[in-house]
Amino acid sequence: MKLAPVKVSKDRIIRTVVGLRPFRPSGFRVEKEKIGEKIVVHNYGHGGGGITLSWGTSHIAIEELFRDDPPRGKVAVLGAGALGLATARLLQRRGVEVTIYAKDLPPQTTSNIAAGQWSPYFVSEFSKRSPRFKEQFARAARLSHRHFQNLLGDYYGVHFLMNYVLSDYPFGRGESGEESLDDLFPESRDVPPGEHPFPVKHVRQYVSMMIEPPVYLEALLRDFLLAKGSIVVRELQDISELQLLAAMGWLESPDALDRPRRFLGAAREAPGDVLRNDVL
């Protein structure tokens, strides 16, 4: 195995970013609720898997919205990050008229500073997962993976990439009772010593998708506007201002901020004037 060395040094860092990740120990919340005369579908608390699970949990959220009593008017979506835009596009594909209400738009969203690796992990504490959540999580991961496969290419900034995980200790085999998602990571194998150039005892390789948030989010926003979607840049003070609501305002949800996870990233120089986000 021959790999080009990664040129990394402090003097090549051009930007450092920090963002909160809305972590809930029990996992994300996708749930339909009626508040007064308003129908609200919550979809928040994805921890470090927001972009990864965005299409899957948004798919489930829209199923909830259409169950029993499908919307007969306009639908409002809160937030213009990965979850809000995915939800808005899925609604448009169902012929629904959508307005996004957001405090910030790309490139100022929290999603813009995510690393963008497709990896459905760090979204909950294993000991606090309910059977219902385990089933919902696995379904969301598979749905999202399939949606992202349809977005491969330069337009959306989604590409397959080989990954290497390095460790001084043997890799675990996952939690018992969890549905395996190994089939979503092709070419996954443990690389024996002598077959890799890394100075560690254990190396695992696998292929996953990498999403470039600045490219991806701008493309989704462009698609939404081309499909005659509306955007209102504002902070909502009262839910009574909206009729039907798909709530993506996860960072303002008290239980999503119960134990927020901090994300630290740095942008470095790369050949060809391309920027890649590196998780530190």
Named regions from a protein language model:
Residues 259-276:
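Flavin (primarily FAD) binding-site architecture
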Residues 31-52, 57-59:
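Short FAD-binding loop at a beta-strand-to-alpha-helix junction that anchors the flavin cofactor
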Residues 83, 106, 264:
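Conserved Rossmann-like nucleotide-cofactor binding loop
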Residues 5-7, 18-37, 111-113, 143-228:
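Flavin (FAD/FMN) cofactor-binding and adjacent substrate-gating region
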Residues 55, 62-65, 196, 202-255, ...:
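Helical element adjacent to the flavin cofactor pocket in flavoenzyme catalytic cores
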Residues 103-134:
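Conserved N-terminal glycine-rich FAD pyrophosphate-binding loop of Rossmann-like flavoproteins
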Residues 73-99:
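N-terminal Rossmann-like FAD-binding beta1-loop-alpha1 element of flavoenzymes
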Residues 49-56, 127, 132-143, 203-219:
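Short beta-strand to alpha-helix junction loop
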